[in-house]
Every structure is written in C-alpha cells, then in structure tokens.
Amino acid sequence: DVLPAGNDKANSVWYYYRGICEERSKQWSKAEADMKKALELQPDQPHVLNYLGYSWIDQGINLDEGMKMIKRAVEQRPDDGYIVDSLGWAYYRIGNYEDAVKNLERAIDLKPEDPTINDHLGDAYWRVGRTLEAKFQWAHARDLKPEPEELPKIEAKIANGLTEDNSNSSAAQAEKKKDDGKGG
C-alpha cells in the first residue's frame, strides 16, 4: 500500500472503505486486517469500531472485544440507528434477548424505515415470547424492500416463526450443536 505518510485520518478512511469492499467480496481475512489497520490509525472512529465489532459478533468470534467496540461506538454516536442496531444485534447473538429488544426498539425509533433493523427486532421479539409483534416487524421488514437474498428468510419467519433452521442466534446455534453432539 502506498499511502501518504502523516495523514492518519485519511488513511484510516481508505483502509475502512477497502475493508468494507473486501468484506462484501467475501474476503474476510483481508477485510479484518484493513479494519484493524483503520483502528490503529484512528482508535476511536465509531464507524470502524461498529463495523468490525458487528462483523465479529455476527460471525460468532471475538464476542467480548466486539461487544466492547460496539459499546464504544454507541457512546460516541448514541443517536445513530445503525450503531444502536449493532448493539441490539450483539445482545441478540449472545442470547441476551431482553437487552436486545431494548436496544433494537431504540434503533427502530432512530431508523424506522430500515428493513434489517425491523427484521432484527422481529427476531428479538420472537425470542422473548412477543410473537405477534415479531410477525408484525417481519412483515414490515418485508414491505421495506430488504436485500433480495434476505426476502425468502423473512417470508419464512412470517410463515413459521423462528426455527432452528432460520435462527440467527449464536446461543441457539450453540445449543443446536450441543444437542446434535457436535459441540458443547
């Protein structure tokens, strides 16, 4: 990489955007390295903290560090619906559904028209037994035109609720592995 010396902020942004491109191109190890480099140059950049922390938690890796990073991002940007969604989703992924609901409801207040946040809140509602509200959120997520690959998943949740096959919870996936004798 040939980037100008002494311009940490600009270089951090460059690594951050390249990391996003790599992550979306399914090149996770390169993306992770670039996100870490971006943080090295700007340790408190909330978008980088959020993106890397969310990515780790969504993959079920580095959960403690990912959660700390997202909390730092929320402290800096408490009114950013996407960052608050990340915190709610992090709680969901570790099985803390009550805190997930609280944060995801806040994220919806901030970004009501985002299909992913509505989908996340639907999942959290389902986990705390608020099934009618869950189906409403999923229907709303569907109507907000989610990414094409997400639409069949959302429609399956509307029809069947959360099942082991469509669950996004690390805790639920760990339980399934334990039940299947594959982990524990």
What are these regions, as identified by a protein language model?
Residues 2-7, 41, 76, 110, ...:
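Structural marker of alpha-solenoid helical repeat scaffolds
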Residues 26, 60-61, 95, 129:
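Residue-level detector of the short coil/turn that links helix A to helix B
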Residues 17, 51, 86, 120, ...:
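Canonical tetratricopeptide repeat
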